[in-house]
Amino acid sequence: MSAGSDAEMAIFGEAAPYLRKSEKERIEAQNKPFDAKTSVFVAEPKESYVKSVIQSKDGGKVTVKTESGATLTVKEDQVFPMNPPKYDKIEDMAMMTHLHEPGVLYNLKERYAAWMIYTYSGLFCVTVNPYKWLPVYNPEVVAAYRGKKRQEAPPHIFSISDNAYQFMLTDRENQSILITGESGAGKTVNTKRVIQYFATIAVTGDKKKEESGKMQGTLEDQIISANPLLEAFGNAKTVRNDNSSRFGKFIRIHFGTTGKLASADIETYLLEKSRVTFQLKAERSYHIFYQITSNKKPELIEMLLITTNPYDYAFVSQGEITVPSIDDQEELMATDSAIDILGFSPEEKVSIYKLTGAVMHYGNMKFKQKQREEQAEPDGTEVADKAAYLQCLNSADLLKALCYPRVKVGNEYVTKGQTVQQVYNAVGALAKAVYEKMFLWMVTRINQQLDTKQPRQYFIGVLDIAGFEIFDFNSLEQLCINFTNEKLQQFFNHHMFVLEQEEYKKEGIEWTFIDFGMDLAACIELIEKPLGIFSILEEECMFPKATDTSFKNKLYDQHLGKSNNFQKPKPTKGKAEAHFSLVHYAGTVDYNITGWLDKNKDPLNDTVVGLYQKSAMKTLASLFSTYASAEADGGAKKGAKKKGSSFQTVSALFRENLNKLMTNLRSTHPHFVRCIIPNETKTPGAMEHELVLHQLRCNGVLEGIRICRKGFPSRILYGDFKQRYKVLNASAIPEGQFIDSKKASEKLLGSIDIDHTQYKFGHTKVFFKAGLLGLLEEMRDEKLAQIITRTQAVCRGYLMRVEYQKMLLRRESIFCIQYNVRAFMNVKHWPWMKLFFKIKPLLKSAETEKEMATMKEEFQKTKDELAKSEAKRKELEEKMVTLLKEKNDLQLQVQSEADSLADAEERCEQLIKNKIQLEAKIKEVTERAEDEEEINAELTAKKRKLEDECSELKKDIDDLELTLAKVEKEKHATENKVKNLTEEMAGLDENIAKLTKEKKALQEAHQQTLDDLQAEEDKVNTLTKAKTKLEQQVDDLEGSLEQEKKLRMDLERAKRKLEGDLKLAQESTMDIENDKQQLDEKLKKKEFEISNLISKIEDEQAVEIQLQKKIKELQARIEELEEEIEAERASRAKAEKQRSDLSRELEEISERLEEAGGATSAQVEMNKKRETEFQKLRRDLEEATLQHEATAAALRKKHADSVAELGEQIDNLQRVKQKLEKEKSELKMEIDDLSSNAEAIAKAKGNLEKMCRTLEDQVSELKSKEEEQQRLINELTAQRARLQTEAGEYSRQLDEKDALVSQLSRSKQASTQQIEELKRQLEEETKAKNALAHALQSSRHDCDLLREQYEEEQEGKAELQRALSKANSEVAQWRTKYETDAIQRTEELEEAKKKLAQRLQAAEEHVEAVNAKCASLEKTKQRLQNEVEDLMIDVERTNAACAALDKKQRNFDKVLSEWRQKYEETQAELESCQKESRTLSTELFKVKNAYEESLDHLETLRRENKNLQQEISDLTEQIAEGGKHIHELEKIKKQVEQEKCEIQAALEEAEASLEHEEGKILRIQLELNQVKSEIDRKIAEKDEEIDQLKRNHVRVVETMQSTLDAEIRSRNDALRVKKKMEGDLNEMEIQLNHANRLAAESLRNYRNTQGILKDTQLHLDDALRGQEDLKEQLAIVERRANLLQAEIEELRATLEQTERSRKIAEQELLDASERVQLLHTQNTSLINTKKKLENDVSQLQSEVEEVIQESRNAEEKAKKAITDAAMMAEELKKEQDTSAHLERMKKNMEQTVKDLQHRLDEAEQLALKGGKKQIQKLEARVRELEGEVENEQKRNAEAVKGLRKHERRVKELTYQTEEDRKNVLRLQDLVDKLQAKVKSYKRQAEEAEEQSNANLAKFRKLQHELEEAEERADIAESQVNKLRVKSREVHTKISAE
């Protein structure tokens, strides 16, 4: 590396002397005298290494003289040669001649002494903390390093940053800078400098401001400002560092395609939240607390309600409160400014300060203990008020939540009391949680602000994470931090050493693999492997009873002695207790595991968190918006997390984040910066040798230098090398012929004058030693300088030669011009020449003018063309620029796509290899898992065998219980003897007290036995084997029977007391029976009320049927009237047409008669008669109209009265319904009271049972022990037989249950098939009904066609009438004309008369034909009416079919209810089986506890037995046979002592195995819980299927109901019956508690339906009124038509009369004209009336259509109500699940339900057409309740039997416990031996279990890795395919262009 001159260093300004030695120093160093043979470094204990000079050598010893003048004699291997002076303070230690520890140490020390803190060490940079400010980060330094290569500038963090930046731009690869080192080494400062550098060099060109949204500064300012804010909340003073980062951060700075800043983001790790509440003495909490209290911003003090003295707050004053190197006031302003720059809103800013202040107040909250209670209560509320105010909470709610939190137990929440310490712990946890979540929220907000949404391509990541920590007290936080450093060190080693050497092998370079001893895999696997420290910690967190001790024991069992990195710490005085030690790369660390389980689970007070979530402060509420407690997570995400945990632990989250970080780092090109802490005292310039050497070793600095020297750190591809360095010797590579790049590179390097041992040729690259590539670069620069100089000389020579030629041409031209000018000067004065001068221009002027004109035209054309060509040229230039830009972009895109494609292919290949390896591992693990499953199956079989033997022993226990009854009989015989033993009472009282205590202990042990089920099974397995041994021991114990007899009659008083207690118990039992009788009487009363309601329902059903009949009759009448109205409407229209035609004819006739000369007198009289008849007809018409109107009004009134009556009936029914609902609620309250009474009775019963047990225990103390021991063997045998029979009985019951389940499954399938069949039948019936409806529609259509035909005939008739009228008018005209011209035109009149007579004859014939046709039409009308009647019959048949369908539906409902009943019975039986199983488990558990407790008291009893035996031996000595008994007792004593030793050893083994067995039991219980949850899930799925079926059938039923909407109109009659039935149902539903919701939902649906029906009824009423109006109008039209018909007939008669008396008609002509005029006016009025009626008809039709549309809407609403009912049915199913506890109350209603069923059958016949749907529902409900009543009665009977049995069992068991206590001496030996065997069995089982768990864990992990690998492979393959397709498209596009 070439050192720059002082002039070159001038650009660094005042930083130059801190970066590189001056030229003067370098020259002095080179001229410094140096003896390479004698100048050495020597190892020395104090200084590690010292500079020395060799004095002499003697064999393997060397004598040296140190700099301080001391003489030392050391071994040769402790002497290291010194580097020449020119290497002093060398910038890259890899360049040193002698590379060793002292050389590196002293180079760093000398540079540090000269304040050159940065030094290269091979491929990475080493920096030493100066502990003072140096001017090496000034802006001029930043500018000086920009764009400089590494070897062109001194070592600096800016150089590393710039190299990473340049690599990112040139290599198009993400970069990372890993700044690592111990705490206090300067990592955070260097991180800030890196960010400063990028923010300076990568800004946009004109420093544009970001004006979007909330941003207050540029992106560069925000990136820089993020550090002060994060440091304020995340940095604190520690022992080693005043500004220590207590969290790790990975800052990614994203750059755009041009290398400018695009955005940034920050990821944080491991915030040390415990520092919020606890600090060591020499440390302090986070800076923000002390910044706030610095009083720089007084408004904060006032806003946060705090003081300026940190000592007032406990959380922040446990250590120091000031730091000399930090000005808290200035830091507060910087923090406040950073918050503003980063775009936090004012509200968010205030929230940050308030939450910080609230944390401070939390530490001052005081609590005290209540008097005579452990419950905590607040000791003052002032501090809590402040904290709650700052968090926008209610102070009382906060204190209540802290002291009385609500805890979820099952599905309910209960209030839990807290001790004072628990409350303080909760407050501390909440403070830490608030602070941590606020910190993470701030990081998220910063990231949102830094994300500018600009396009970004690559990023540079800067990692600043807490360094390695070794404290006196190291906890879980230190383990996580140290583990992170282990992983980073491993990544560094892998990148620097392993990958480097693997690259050599891959390229085929001769290389001997060097093991640098930096393999950290052992320590990492110890921490993170499946059975490592984190795995065991997470496993312990899953167990509720796990403690720190159990965690430590598991760690020791798993790793102590098995791993060299796991050690047991040695106790050291003055230091905190350590539980285990880990050997890290940086040293051995002692860890204290106190509180690790709680830290890992990180529990919070859920009640306070709930308050936080509801806080008015948005920030606080958002912090905890996603929080869910462990219980809630367990319920919501069961099985979703790894290893079955219901929540993610701190360690799991930490490992997940760490893995993400390592993945990010592996995807980048890393640059390493090693920070070194020079001393522990923070003294500038001082360096502790041992401390620095330790860091150099641990950081891998020396190994990095060594491999850099030995290896080949620089490499380049052959093609690139040939292209770049060909210039060094172009002649070495021949031109014009192909030559391989590798051979060309070899020739080129061979021809250059360099050291040929400094490079190697690989397969694809050429490798260089350190420094050689730099030398080649310098040679290339020199060669390029030479070539450029030569090129410049040639170019300059060429240019000068061209200029010389131009000069020659100019010279010749000048000579020519001079010659011509001289000649001209000689001849210009000649006369001829003057004339020539004058004439010559004139000759050419004309030509010149023409030429000028031509030239102008050409000039103009040329100018235009030039303009066009210029525009075209510009356009083409723009296109060319655009195309060039697109071409460049495409080339860049193709290149990037090619690079990414290659990378993706490489990753894909790697993933495929990993996948294959993982598949092989999975196959292996699967095989091992199968083996383990087989072993588990064998263990399960053994377990079942043990269970069988346990059942046999239970039978033996039952036999023992029978002895209680016998002892009761003997009690009376002992009463007389007790009087004689009263004197011995005092001596025996103590024994009795002991026995009582032992009895209680045995009972407690009996209860505890349930927790150790598996261990007891093993013990029971050997009890049967010990029976023979017990028989032998009985003979030995017979000698002690005499003394035991005395204990039979010792407590007469106790007996009397027991008898009194028994009497009290009997009296309480009688009270309970009386309460039961009262309940029965109440139930009977309710049954009587139900029967009354049923009778009411029947009456209402009868009324409903009558109303339905009336409605049907009215509907039929309405239809007939509608048809008549239509017919009359048509006939009326035709009559109107006829009337108008006749009017016109009359007018014509009158005109003709006037023309003929007037009318005769006869005609006048006829006209008068006609007029009178017309007046008469008009009066008749008006009278008929009035009569019809009166009739219509009467009908209307009648209809309105009927509607009002029906409304009143509806209101009455509503009131009845409300009354019934009220009675229902009252009955429900009574049922609740009865339930509470029953619970009180049950409690009283339990208390009585306890009293009975106590009395029985006291009675058992009076029992004789002689006969008990005498009968012991026989009773055990009997008990065994009984247990065997019970086991057989249980197995038989189990088989029966299985058979029942299978039978129910079959019945379920049959029910499903039956349901499908019913569905099919329903569809067929629906199809038939649709066919009938279609036929009815077609018939109606035919009817309409015939009606139209009838109307056409009427129109024809009207036409004839018009013709007749026309003829009459003609007659009148002729008459008039005749009167005028009678004399003149007599003949004409005669002819006209004849013609008129002919025309009248023809008209009469036509009229007759029309009348005949009308008669035929009447017949047709009659026939159609008959057809309509037939269709009505068909409709009735359809209704009958609907009724049949209803009946089938009811049958279906019956089948469904029976199936539901069977299902519920099966579920109840399943629950009872589960209860029995739990009861048996409880009993077995109690037995096991009793046995274990008997072991505890065995020794005491044995000593007592020995004393008794000694007394027996003393008594026998007084007799003659004393000696013999003593000898026998001594034998027994020896034997017992020997057995005692054996038992003691076995007992210890059994205890150890018992612990293992307990762990096994816990694991099995977890597995059982998982299986149970799976079964519950399947049951839930089945329930959902059943619910779906129910919903489907409900929809079918509701659809059928919608087809009967017409019948719903008759609901008023059926309402009374329905209400009565609902009342009965409500009486029964009182027993169903939560199932009442179904009734409520159904009631609401019914009300909605009633509302819809009321609307429909109103529309129907409107339609009926409209129909009545139409009927009235029809009657009017009919009367008018009849009048017209009569008028036509009279006109016909008039015509005949006119023919006979023509003369009279002439006289009456004038009157006829007047009448015609009157008729005309009347006709016009009738036409207007007709139009009005037609408008009314059209309006009525529109109203009818509206009614139809409204009915359709009502149908849609009904369907919607049906869907709502289905949803409510689903909710009902959920609510029914909670009604199991009321089933016992339902059983008493069985008889009532049967009566209801009978009456419902009768009601069904009465209301077949009425309230069918309601009755069907009620019947189904009744049947359901009937089944439930039966089940409840059965269960009640079984419960009574079980109660009696359990009472008997309790008595027997209490007696048996006394028997066990007395017989414990004989059982001792047997139990000890059993325990020994149990130990061995447990040990074997535990080992198998552990091996199985380990294998399963490995299998799961491998399976998970395989899945991830497969996913990655698939993703990579898809990406490769996409990239290939994209690349092809790009190439195609380029080629097309």
Swiss-Prot record:
Highest taxon of source: Eukaryota
Coiled-coil annotated residue ranges, if any: 842-1937
Residue numbers bearing the Pros-methylhistidine modification: H756
Modified residue annotations for Phosphotyrosine: Y389, Y424, Y1463, Y1491
Location of the Myosin motor domain: 88-781
Binding residue positions for ATP: G181, E182, S183, G184, A185, G186, K187, T188
Residue(s) carrying Phosphothreonine: T66, T71, T419, T1254, T1285, T1466, T1500, T1516, T1729
Biased composition regions of type Basic and acidic residues, renumbered to the chain: 1127-1155
Subunit structure: Muscle myosin is a hexameric protein that consists of 2 heavy chain subunits (MHC), 2 alkali light chain subunits (MLC) and 2 regulatory light chain subunits (MLC-2).
GO BP term (any one): ATP metabolic process
Protein's name according to its UniProt entry: Myosin-8
Keyword Phosphoprotein: yes
Family of this protein: Belongs to the TRAFAC class myosin-kinesin ATPase superfamily. Myosin family.
Taxonomic lineage: Eukaryota, Metazoa, Chordata, Craniata, Vertebrata
Role: Muscle contraction.
Chain positions covered by the region annotation Actin-binding: 658-680, 760-774
